[in-house]
Amino acid sequence: MTAPWAALALLWGSLCVGSGRGEAETRECIYYNANWELERTNQSGLERCEGEQDKRLHCYASWRNSSGTIELVKKGCWLDDFNCYDRQECVATEENPQVYFCCCEGNFCNERFTHLPEAGGPEVTYEPPPTAPTLLTVLAYSLLPIGGLSLIVLLAFWMYRHRKPPYGHVDIHEDPGPPPPSPLVGLKPLQLLEIKARGRFGCVWKAQLMNDFVAVKIFPLQDKQSWQSEREIFSTPGMKHENLLQFIAAEKRGSNLEVELWLITAFHDKGSLTDYLKGNIITWNELCHVAETMSRGLSYLHEDVPWCRGEGHKPSIAHRDFKSKNVLLKSDLTAVLADFGLAVRFEPGKPPGDTHGQVGTRRYMAPEVLEGAINFQRNAFLRIDMYAMGLVLWELVSRCKAADGPVDEYMLPFEEEIGQHPSLEELQEVVVHKKMRPAIKDHWLKHPGLAQLCVTIEECWDHDAEARLSAGCVEERVSLIRRSVNGTTSDCLVSLVTSVTNVDLPPKESSI
């Protein structure tokens, strides 16, 4: 009876050793950085891996293969990636990426790396000069079959019960249509870092793509239509503009029931205009810069460009969910328009697609949207955007310290009148029937620039949609107001306080 129990104990001991090694074995990796001079690091050597207790550690390698010549890019430690679990060898499987990437578990396992395409293409291997086997190597290979098999079974059961893969394998072959080509799609690794926002259609992560930070908007499978719509807007010719969010890639990640739909875009650390105004009071010049670049972005989005920089025809596009949460800020407070999931294109001879009337964020809905009386024509949708722009401009003015008076805590439009979570009926009563708008404070009107800007705001949110300004007109006005105020001396400012008509604003005829 003792022999079977001894064998079982021996098996269990090797199992425990193998299990322990699976998560703790990777302590050091081969290090290499081709850009060591620019990044001011060592070129090569060994890297000691450090991470959180519940995270697994791996080694990775990335390289280029130009006509059979292997060019190393980077090697080093990599943190807790599901694709690296239980891989003793560093093997890349992508067909033809611009940069090959592989990861593995085990000390120095990235010393040797291999490209082995899943389709069965030729194997390309980089192998360092051979070294004589050591006793430790012989022992490791002797225990590897038993320990490895046991570890795989345990890990498979544990992962099934406790977690799903944090970063799935790229799977774009079932895509409903080809994403626009992007030079960064093939670059690896991409690692999710932290959730920055949650919205109607999913969450937005800050992620790292090689040496750059990017934003990853993750849609659940049930919101596939929104992901597809936003991807199609981004793929429209002429969508590259300094005041529109930069698109990088669209991908499917995972498989079967674990599929997630990713949109990868530029990352802006200051976040949305809403978040920035909550925590910051802005100056007059900052207000003008945000307002001018924001209106420039919306003006370009609305514009129909017959031949845009050789890319083809850029149609007029209505945003349909314009709000301060969907305006991002660059490091210099330049505004960038984002979230085109509800946007609609107006192409000659083609229907504009889904033009359901009551879409967007309820608080920012124009009167005609709230009462369901929309004219389903291009100009009607652009004017709806302009009503929302008036509300966002009001948010900017409400947090500006230029006027001689108190700056209140940040509040959303109509929050003072009907609270943070208004119903559709409450908004209809206030906006449509009572024709109320957010309050314009008396002390704002004593500042020459803010007073003129308030006139522009009122012409953006006019109850009569046809009387509203265009985005291009708002851009012109803000630029003119800024120059007129900044170009005056303090003596002139005193005289301007009593009259805000000293500067001729662009006429309403420049509206849509």
Curated annotation (Swiss-Prot):
Spans annotated as Interaction with DYNLT1: 491-512
E.C. number: 2.7.11.30
Record-level GO cellular component terms: activin receptor complex; plasma membrane
Post-translational modification (record): Phosphorylated. Constitutive phosphorylation is in part catalyzed by its own kinase activity.
Disulfide bonds: 29-59, 49-77, 84-103, 90-102, 104-109
Extracellular compartment segments: 19-137
Pfam families: Activin_recp, Pkinase
Localisation: Cell membrane
Keyword annotations: ATP-binding, Cell membrane, Disulfide bond, Glycoprotein, Kinase, Magnesium, Manganese, Membrane, Metal-binding, Nucleotide-binding, Phosphoprotein, Receptor, Serine/threonine-protein kinase, Signal, Transferase, Transmembrane, Transmembrane helix
Membrane topology term: Single-pass type I membrane protein
Signal peptide annotation: 1-18
Required co-factors: Mg(2+); Mn(2+)
List of glycosylated residues: 42, 65
Reaction catalyzed: L-threonyl-[receptor-protein] + ATP = O-phospho-L-threonyl-[receptor-protein] + ADP + H(+); L-seryl-[receptor-protein] + ATP = O-phospho-L-seryl-[receptor-protein] + ADP + H(+)
Chain segments annotated as transmembrane: 138-158
Positions annotated as active site in the UniProt record: 321
Residues noted as binding ATP in the record, renumbered to the chain: 196-204, 217
Domain annotation Protein kinase: ranges: 190-480
Top-level division of the source organism's lineage: Eukaryota
SUPFAM superfamilies, alphabetized: Protein kinase-like (PK-like), Snake toxin-like
UniProt topological domain (Cytoplasmic) ranges: 159-512
Biological process, per Gene Ontology: activin receptor signaling pathway; cellular response to growth factor stimulus; pattern specification process
Biological role stated in the UniProt entry: Transmembrane serine/threonine kinase activin type-2 receptor forming an activin receptor complex with activin type-1 serine/threonine kinase receptors (ACVR1, ACVR1B or ACVR1c). Transduces the activin signal from the cell surface to the cytoplasm and is thus regulating many physiological and pathological processes including neuronal differentiation and neuronal survival, hair follicle development and cycling, FSH production by the pituitary gland, wound healing, extracellular matrix production, immunosuppression and carcinogenesis.
Protein name in the entry: Activin receptor type-2B
Provenance organism: Sus scrofa (Pig)
